[in-house]
Swiss-Prot record:
Top-level taxonomy: Archaea, Thermoproteota, Thermoprotei, Desulfurococcales, Pyrodictiaceae
Organism whose genome encodes this protein: Hyperthermus butylicus (strain DSM 5456 / JCM 9403 / PLM1-5)
Swiss-Prot/TrEMBL site (Cleavage (non-hydrolytic)) positions: E80, S81
GO biological process, one term: polyamine biosynthetic process
Domain of life according to the entry: Archaea
Protein task: Specifically catalyzes the decarboxylation of L-arginine to agmatine. Has no S-adenosylmethionine decarboxylase (AdoMetDC) activity.
Cofactor: pyruvate
Protein name: Arginine decarboxylase proenzyme
């Protein structure tokens, strides 16, 4: 059963016709295994990443998957979109995804904060501009 929850307006903003969508995502390699198993630490890192990036936290969920190839997943719903970390401690590997809608939050700050706290040996980061095209309407797709 799905539960609908009302949240305050203002998290997703449009500047005229342009919806500002910024997506920063990447892979972290050589992260300490203990950090990648620590569900509470990862949750705290995501909460603080949302704060430093000027995002409004709505809810956060964590899951731990035990055994070899297990790991931890942390997903934060923010008014602006989401932040997630998925870990594979046996490989010292994590993926990070930060997506925001609106001009007032900065996904780069959240991503960089997570990298700072997890201290990977190296990482690969990608950026996608997910903004709409000014003046483009649904009827023009047809």
């Amino acid at each position: 059963m799905a539960v609908q929850q009302n949240v305050k307006k203002g998290g997703r903003e449009a500047g005229g016709d342009l919806i500002v969508g910024k997506h920063v995502y990447g892979n972290l390699y050589g992260v300490d295994e203990e950090k990648l198993w620590d569900e509470e630490l990862l949750k705290d890192i995501v909460v603080e990443a949302a704060r430093v990036a000027n995002m409004n936290l709505v809810d956060i969920k964590t899951w731990k998957f035990t055994g070899f190839h297990g790991g931890v997943s942390v997903i934060a719903l923010v008014l602006e979109s989401h932040i997630s970390i998925h870990t594979w401690p046996d490989y010292g590997y994590a993926t990070v995804d930060v997506y925001t809608c609106g001009a007032n939050s900065d996904p780069w700050k959240a991503f960089n904060y997570i990298v700072l706290k997890l201290k990977p040996r190296y990482y690969i980061v990608h950026y996608a501009d997910r903004s709409s095209i000014p003046g483009y309407t649904e009827s023009e797709k047809r």
